[in-house]
Structure formats: C-alpha cells, structure tokens
C-alpha cells in the first residue's frame, strides 16, 4: 500500500493494514509507505480487541503517522469483543523515516504535532517488540514529533507489561526513546542505538560507529535471513533518488 492521501475527514481514522477485534492474525511480507491520513496514518495497526497478533518481516517508510499503532479499549461486553489488546508481537520489521506529521489535528493530540514511530494507547498488555530496525531521518521541520515509543491513555486505561528487547535504532538527531506517561511495568533490554537518543535508566545502549549489519545481524537466527531475502529488491526514495533498502540499513 502506498500514497494514501488525506481524503478522510478528521472524524475517521485510517492505517495501512489493521486487524480489528481479531485473534491470531499474521501480517507479514508487506510494504506500506507515504500514508497521509489526517488521523492515525500508521503503516500497521493492531487495533481494539486483538489477541496474539503477529507483525513480522514488513517494511514501512515515509508514513506521516508512524510505523505502528497498538491500541486497546476497555469496558466492552465480554461476549462482544475482548477488552484491551493482548500479546501483540512486532518482530523483524524495518521502519525508515516514519513519523512525519507537520500539522495539528482537532480530533486527537490537538496540542502537539503527534507522530511517534510507535504509539501504544489504551490497555495494551504483554506486547512484545523485538528485533526490529528503526532507521530515523532528521525531521524536515522543527515542530515534528521526535519520539520513538509513546504510551497514551484511551478509555481511561494505559498499557501494562509491554516488552521491548533487542531493537536497533539509528537516530541522527536527538529523539526521545520512550514516553511512558501512566503505563506500568514495561520492560526494556538489549536495545542498541547509534546517534542521539534520550533513553530511560536501563535497556538501551549507545553504540559507536555506523549503523550497519554488524550491529544487528545474527547468522544463527534464520529470521534475519528471511527478512533480508524479502528486502533484497526493495528501494525507497531518498532526496530524489531510489536507494536500495539493504544499503540504507547497512546490510550490503
């Protein structure tokens, strides 16, 4: 999916690929780019009432809203849909230059230019975010959001017990790693970054040098080879030129 325009009113939200009130959904081997929906505008979304969703081996780039939304709600009848968002897994994906919204919206977050790379809102429980590559670019305008992971309230609830481990981040300008607000019991470990990242007390480690394969690739983990095979023919536009994704992430 690419080049989704700003056609919907602010009363309607839209993302690239999004299961809703679903169990055991598998989303893999997809590309979403240049999503410009006024509300949301993420490449991927594990939405209300989902359990055990898996998002893996996907590519996302240049999306106004960001790479991904994980959202849970609260207070629904149990025979209609599960409350919250339970055990979504986000693994072995690549996000490049996501989170570009340069305007305010009246629908939500109306006081900020809100577009974190990943947004967790409402009751998200035991989400696992692991072994993803987040390659950030300098934002083209000073007011644009510079946040990697952001938790917010929805239906009077917040995330709890979400796990972030072994993710790899390139941040060429100062970016906030996590805004937790009132979420609780989240865990961070083994995350590595090159560049400038405002980090919590533990779980993120700065690496010197350049962002390339030596930082994140493990030949004994077949998932990396599956991802690289999917990306081998993919290109993205950068400064008017089509560049190979594998070159951007330092895999070649």
Question: Whereabouts are the PLM-identified features?
Answer:
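Generic detector of leucine side chains in alpha-helical contexts
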Residues: 1, 8, 26, 59, ...
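Right-handed parallel beta-helix
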Residues: 1-7, 15-18, 23-36, 42-45, ...
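Extracellular beta-strand/beta-solenoid scaffold signature
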Residues: 7-19, 38-47, 63-81, 104-121, ...
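Acidic, glycine- and Ser/Thr-rich low-complexity intrinsically disordered tracts
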Residues: 111, 127-129, 137-141, 152-252
């Amino acid at each position: 999916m690419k080049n989704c325009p700003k056609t919907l009113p602010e009363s309607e939200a839209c993302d690239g690929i999004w299961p809703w009130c679903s169990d055991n959904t598998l989303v893999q081997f997809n590309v979403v780019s240049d999503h410009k929906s006024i509300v949301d505008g993420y490449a991927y979304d594990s939405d209300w009432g989902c359990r055990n969703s898996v998002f893996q081996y996907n590519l996302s780039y240049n999306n106004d809203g960001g790479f991904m939304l994980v959202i849970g709600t609260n207070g629904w009848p149990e025979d209609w849909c599960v409350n919250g968002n339970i055990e979504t897994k986000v693994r072995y994906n690549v996000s490049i230059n996501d989170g570009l919204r340069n305007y305010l919206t009246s629908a939500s977050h109306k006081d900020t230019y809100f577009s974190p790379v990943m947004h967790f809102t409402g009751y998200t429980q035991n989400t696992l975010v692991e072994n993803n590559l987040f390659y950030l670019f300098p934002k083209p305008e000073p007011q644009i959001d510079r946040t990697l992971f952001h938790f917010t309230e929805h239906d009077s609830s917040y995330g709890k017990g979400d796990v972030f481990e072994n993710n790899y981040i390139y941040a060429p300008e100062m970016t906030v790693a996590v805004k937790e607000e009132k979420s609780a019991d989240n865990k961070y470990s083994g995350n590595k970054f090159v560049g400038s990242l405002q980090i919590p007390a533990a779980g993120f480690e700065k690496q010197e040098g350049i962002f390339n394969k030596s930082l994140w690739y493990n030949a004994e983990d077949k998932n990396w080879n599956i991802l690289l095979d999917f990306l081998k023919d993919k290109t993205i536009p950068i400064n008017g030129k089509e560049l190979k994704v594998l070159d951007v992430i330092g895999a070649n």
